[in-house]
């Protein structure tokens, strides 16, 4: 379980996050939803360990990780632009992190992930020969072979549309449940958040407006902001 206790963060005297508290269960998919500048990316960076809070704590599996550096947390992120190496093939991108951690995944586990994500026929292609959906799946595979303790996704569907978007959504759910992997998604798209998530966190100007199930968000909005979002 991941627990955030009274997290606050300011920059140059401006409060970006204010007293954020919530708990996320193992294998839950939680979307952080908010408009631009709401603080959702700052919250993602706090969880990842890229920055530290001004106050509050982050507890993961009963361990206080507030001051634990990013590289020791074991949380992995898939960025909005995929951050793939264009000069490498899809396969070499997928196994790139295993160069320094060869025991993290076996060859059979890598093969299973590739099959799960439907990438078998694309392994020898360079990144610029892949579609947006294929790049997203390569980025997911590259992250999953490292066996993250938590999976963080920054706007994973923003560059996709139609059938491809629905396919990636299905695969994210399959991964979270199949690997018992807590998954946190940052998005600005209410439809995306409400259809993929177990819980949705709505942030407005650094404050929690509501944290609940999609049904609660739709049928029991706690503020006019949530109702009109």
Q: At which residue positions do the language-model features occur?
A:
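ABC ATPase NBD coupling module
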Residues: 64-79, 100, 217-221
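Conserved ABC ATPase "signature" region
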Residues: 105-122, 173-174
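Conserved ABC ATPase signature
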Residues: 126-130, 134
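A short, proline-enriched helix->beta-strand linker immediately N-terminal to the Walker B motif
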Residues: 145-149
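ABC ATPase "signature
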Residues: 211-212, 220
